[in-house]
Structure formats: C-alpha cells, structure tokens
Amino acid sequence: PLESYGIKCMSIGFLVSVDTPTIWRGPMVMKALEQMFNGVEWGQLDYLIIDLPPGTGDAQLTLAQSSKLSGSIIVSTPQDVALNDARKGINMFKRVNVPVIGLVENMSYFICDNCNEKHYIFSHEGAKKEAEKFQIPFLGSLPIDKELRIQSDEGRPACIDKPEGDIAKKYLEIA
C-alpha cells in the first residue's frame, strides 16, 4: 500500500487513471474489495479503516458477513436524504452484529468570512438527533471549511498542517 504520514492507504482509485470511471457490478466490486482487504500486505496494524460508499449495498453486507469487524462508524451529512442512508447503515450493521461505534456529522455548518457566524445550510444537528434516537454515541461534527479543502487537495492532513487549528481539534475530539 501507499504510505503517507505513517498511514497506509489503498484505493481502487490508485488502480485506474483519474478520468477512468469504475463502472463495476457487484461481483467486480466484491472481488476488488476482497483483494484490497486480504491481498494487500498491510503489515502490523493498530486499525484498518475501510471507507465505503453510503447505504447498505453488496460491499457493506459482504464485508460485514465475511470479516470480523470490531465496529462501524457512520458518517452522514445533516440533511434528511443523507440521514436515510445513515439509518439504513446503522440498522444493517446492528442486524449483522457489527457494533456501531458512533455517528459523525460532516458538513454540519460553515462559518461566514464576513459575519463570522455559523450557517447551517443542510439542516441542524440531524446526525446528533439520529444518534440519540438509536442510542449510539454522537462522535462530533465537522464544518464545511475552505482551508480544510485546500489542505486535503494539497495532501496536507489538517492535524499535521495546523495541529492547534479548530479542524485538527475537532478531528482529535472525534478520534
């Protein structure tokens, strides 16, 4: 796997050019996921974090049934349509006996450069309310942040680039 800042990474995106779509059906996705999960020499790991698309598709179900997952973290934006997928994910993981460690709300708000106030354009605390309904921990919320976007585009993790910054502190609170 590729390694950056002490984190080992593997992605289907590393295997195709940037402009090439991955138009794969379930079996192809599952084969690729299985190869990345079992065929990559990860070495000694403290954690293996698997970023999956939203919902309860073949990838999530097969991974949950074929691997000993210690837990899942659901990430959602606060609007209703995204929370529908979050609910499905929570219910699926509970059904297959994978503990739901918690829920994170992404793109919770942005802070206006002009007035310095928070604006909740996608609703307010939707993921927090869902966590309460499901009686699972709400791990935290992350804002829409221009500096974070720039750091990400340039490959500079917020926690390393500005460890005392607000975004780094939010990541550490969630972790």
Where are these regions (language model features)?
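Nucleotide-state-sensitive switch-loop elements of NTP-binding domains
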Residues: P1-I49, L69-G71
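Conserved phosphate/pyrophosphate-binding and hydrolysis machinery centered on Walker-type P-loop NTPases
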Residues: G26, P53, E164
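Predominant activation on well-ordered alpha-helical scaffold segments within soluble catalytic domains
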Residues: M30, E34-N38, L61-A64, R87-I90, ...
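Short beta-alpha connecting loops at secondary-structure transitions
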Residues: T20, I74, N114, A158-I160
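Glycine-rich phosphate-binding loops of nucleotide-dependent enzymes
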Residues: M10, L33, L52, Q65, ...
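C-terminal boundary of histidine-terminating zinc-finger modules
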Residues: E154-I167
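Conserved catalytic-core segment of NTP-binding enzymes
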Residues: D46-Y47, P53-Q151
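Residues on a specific face of well-ordered alpha-helices
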Residues: P27-K31, E125, E132, K169
